[in-house]
């Protein structure tokens, strides 16, 4: 009887129902992996693996282009983006394309161009993927040594890491260039309710930029998610760009130190596990960012945050009842606390009622009404502008609380709109994917460590007690 694992390879046993099935000339016997393990069969075939990765990039870019055009085709300019289930157009609008004051869409042509460019790019990537998967050399080491590699070659691996870091740094600089020189980006804090503007006065102070990293992630601190002005965001990308580029150059020019050689497992599956861990962290951070941050993700495009919708409801009814003659400064609510206004634990004047829990919300429609000690009573009586009333009424009825088959919005709000907020979609999907990637990290890290420790062949079954027990029947 043939042994289950290949003598040529050193991977886990994969027991197949049909061990003789051959796909693309690579069967389980020669690769150690079954057909359904996909790219695992290509672990040591750098040329074929390149094809798989390029084709995968093509699929990703094709989705981006096709979905982009789908959203353009369905877009109704009269309705806010967040009511239309859009997740790509809000990103383009945030970059300042096609929008004007208040986030109003003036021109959808840039969105169309974006979709077409992604489709064309995906065709190029798709062709490259098919070429390298089917026609190109199986391995790159002989013909193209610069692009070839061996997984355990630590120096080559850190060189590849360095190249990736430089590309990421250049990507960060692209956003900086867009904000500084190519039309600017959308600033939800621009006076009068948001506008596209060039970011001129960058925040480059390391104490400010790295201060975000040192903040607590909880409550009113909010770690990097608490960033609330574009100068800090674009300045942060300047720092990130330089750090990534210089880190990349460092990794290209140096070899791993002894402690790093000892600390890491140096195999393809280990690198996969490290990458999955990083993507998992990114997913969890993105989840919090899109859920809580209304500067990087402006509410004009993504809908209000949960706290923002709640505070907007309190503000809307304060405006209504003040018009009807209520004295909002002294009216008592059912609990004996202020009905419209109360004090926070640190003494600021905040909105009363259930929304007190969201007292540290900052939003561009609300900040003009604050003074040095929180909400300013005289401003609430005299300075409320029509655009602030309109926007808060709109946000009140569009809380990001809907489920797929129910009415969206606050359960007690009779005017709530039946929709699911893009914030709900994006934060939930990134949390779920972040979690799955974390599980994938644990799985592949465990396999990589087992292989490195030398017991990847599985357990010796010869002495299992079950082999010596009587059959159940």
Swiss-Prot record:
Cofactor binding remark: Binds multiple chlorophylls and provides some of the ligands for the Ca-4Mn-5O cluster of the oxygen-evolving complex. It may also provide a ligand for a Cl- that is required for oxygen evolution. PSII binds additional chlorophylls, carotenoids and specific lipids.
Q: From which organism does this entry originate?
A: Agrostis stolonifera (Creeping bentgrass)
Question: Entry's InterPro entries?
Answer: PS_antenna-like, PS_II_antenna-like_sf, PSII_PsbC, PSII_PsbC_sf
Q: Where, subcellularly, is it found?
A: Plastid, Chloroplast thylakoid membrane
Protein name per UniProt: Photosystem II CP43 reaction center protein
GO terms of biological process kind: photosynthetic electron transport in photosystem II
Per UniProt, the keywords (alphabetical) are: Acetylation, Chlorophyll, Chloroplast, Chromophore, Manganese, Membrane, Metal-binding, Phosphoprotein, Photosynthesis, Photosystem II, Plastid, Thylakoid, Transmembrane, Transmembrane helix
Q: Where are the transmembrane segments?
A: 69-93, 134-155, 178-200, 255-275, 291-312, 447-471
Residues that bear N-acetylthreonine: 15
Residues binding [CaMn4O5] cluster: 367
State the family it belongs to. Belongs to the PsbB/PsbC family. PsbC subfamily.
